[in-house]
């Protein structure tokens, strides 16, 4: 009888660095909200939430880098212990609705597992929106959905 082995292989996408001198940046439309994500219904019928932040960046931008850019324009988010819960809002062409997918969490003043995740690794596509739930340090950190492993 032969022995059979089973191996679980986690596929990690290659980080493709972008030559930022030669590559045109994309317009990242970011919507921040305190304590919660915006409702997906706020993105329907050509509408978007009113508090838009426009950032020109590249697909290799990390969540840590995006956190820094949001902190630069929003002084309230600079306090140590502030959580940034990132989600991509993207169109679902099958049912003509938008869907939201959480992609990571960063925290001001703390290193985290998602800090170096890039937009490309999060499968961000040009035209998607970025929705950020900002949780101040005096509140509980955002609850993470269980990852389907």
Model-derived features with residue positions:
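Ubiquitin system architectures
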Residues: 2-149
